[in-house]
């Protein structure tokens, strides 16, 4: 078992402790202050019974959804573009100058023909200050979920520059989805500290577990409306959105902030 997973489970245990109310109030308020979190859409920091409850806070003011394909989460755009071919594999960038194999990222969640015309992608990084829940970016059907075991490196920009193939090395869950235009994937990449990802539609998907093995689960008639909640990270992480070529036209710039509900593609 890797040190990153052991340390993440320890951090998760501590984050889940419900301290006496006054102590928890101080912990939460200092966390909010340190990360400069805007709490205007959420309950007051003192109302969360643990640090993990603060991490996974729910919106108190519903977001309005813009027209088109919306961001599944809050975060920062780290990279956006089209894949390139090398040695008959499709490659994308985690960050400028650092490429990885899309086939390795997706593992068993694709058929070869689904990638033959190329792919477009966007990487959304969720920092510790961001809203940690993720949602359906459009009316869609989830066809399958593929769990791939791995380590839990931090996924911030500094580590992406230092560690090659980081997304491929980290634990992740890939959702294969379909809308009226075609196939796309939502890849939820685990990260150091806690490392937990939860999916509302399948509680049996367990991440950062002591015993783990790769698997794929297929679903029938698992439909979601645009904006419907899919699950949440515990602490920050990354969502990689990959679509068949021509399915989506991304209107994004690297480095820009994004909010769940805002349009990211036509």
Curated annotation (Swiss-Prot):
Organism superkingdom: Bacteria
Enzymatic reactions: a 1,2-diacyl-sn-glycero-3-phospho-L-serine + H(+) = a 1,2-diacyl-sn-glycero-3-phosphoethanolamine + CO2
Pathway: Phospholipid metabolism; phosphatidylethanolamine biosynthesis; phosphatidylethanolamine from CDP-diacylglycerol: step 2/2
Binding note for cofactor: Binds 1 pyruvoyl group covalently per subunit.
Gene Ontology molecular function, alphabetical: phosphatidylserine decarboxylase activity
Enzyme Commission number(s) of this protein: 4.1.1.65
Site (Cleavage (non-hydrolytic)): 236-237
PTM section of the record: Is synthesized initially as an inactive proenzyme. Formation of the active enzyme involves a self-maturation process in which the active site pyruvoyl group is generated from an internal serine residue via an autocatalytic post-translational modification. Two non-identical subunits are generated from the proenzyme in this reaction, and the pyruvate is formed at the N-terminus of the alpha chain, which is derived from the carboxyl end of the proenzyme.
Keywords per UniProt: Cell membrane, Decarboxylase, Lipid biosynthesis, Lipid metabolism, Lyase, Membrane, Phospholipid biosynthesis, Phospholipid metabolism, Pyruvate, Zymogen
Pyruvic acid (Ser) modifications at: 237
Membrane topology according to the record: Peripheral membrane protein
Residue positions of the active site: 74 (charge relay system), 135 (charge relay system), 237 (charge relay system), 237 (schiff-base intermediate with substrate)
Subunit structure: Heterodimer of a large membrane-associated beta subunit and a small pyruvoyl-containing alpha subunit.
Enzyme class: lyase
Known function: Catalyzes the formation of phosphatidylethanolamine (PtdEtn) from phosphatidylserine (PtdSer).
HAMAP family: PS_decarb_PSD_B_type1 (MF_00662)
Cofactor requirement: pyruvate
PANTHER family assigned to the protein according to its UniProt record, in alphabetical order: PHOSPHATIDYLSERINE DECARBOXYLASE, PHOSPHATIDYLSERINE DECARBOXYLASE PROENZYME, MITOCHONDRIAL
Identification of the protein by name: Phosphatidylserine decarboxylase proenzyme
Single GO biological process annotation from the record: phosphatidylethanolamine biosynthetic process
Locations listed in the record: Cell membrane
Recorded family membership: Belongs to the phosphatidylserine decarboxylase family. PSD-B subfamily. Prokaryotic type I sub-subfamily.
Cellular compartments per GO CC: plasma membrane
């Amino acid at each position: 078992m890797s040190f990153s997973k052991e340390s993440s489970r320890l951090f998760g245990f501590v984050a889940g402790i419900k301290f006496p109310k006054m102590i928890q109030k101080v912990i939460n308020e200092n966390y909010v202050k340190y990360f400069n979190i805007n709490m205007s859409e959420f309950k007051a920091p003192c109302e969360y019974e643990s640090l993990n409850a603060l991490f996974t806070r729910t919106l108190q003011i519903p977001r309005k959804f813009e027209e088109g394909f919306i961001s599944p989460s809050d975060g920062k755009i780290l990279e956006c573009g089209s894949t390139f071919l090398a040695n008959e594999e499709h490659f994308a960038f985690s960050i400028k100058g650092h490429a990885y194999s899309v086939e390795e990222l997706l593992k068993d969640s694709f058929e070869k023909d689904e990638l033959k015309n190329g792919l477009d992608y966007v990487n959304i990084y969720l920092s510790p200050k961001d809203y940690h829940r993720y949602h359906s970016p459009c009316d869609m059907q989830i066809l399958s979920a593929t769990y791939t075991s791995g380590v839990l490196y931090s996924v911030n920009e500094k580590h992406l520059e230092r560690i090659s193939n980081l997304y491929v090395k980290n634990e992740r869950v890939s959702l294969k989805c379909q809308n009226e235009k075609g196939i796309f994937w939502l890849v939820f990449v685990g990260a150091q500290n806690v490392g937990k990802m939860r999916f509302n539609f399948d509680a049996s998907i367990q991440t950062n577990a002591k015993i783990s093995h790769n698997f794929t689960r297929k679903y029938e008639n698992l439909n979601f409306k645009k904006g419907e909640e899919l699950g949440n990270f515990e602490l920050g992480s990354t969502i990689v959105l990959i679509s068949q070529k021509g399915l989506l036209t991304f209107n994004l710039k690297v480095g820009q902030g994004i909010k769940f509900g805002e349009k990211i593609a036509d």
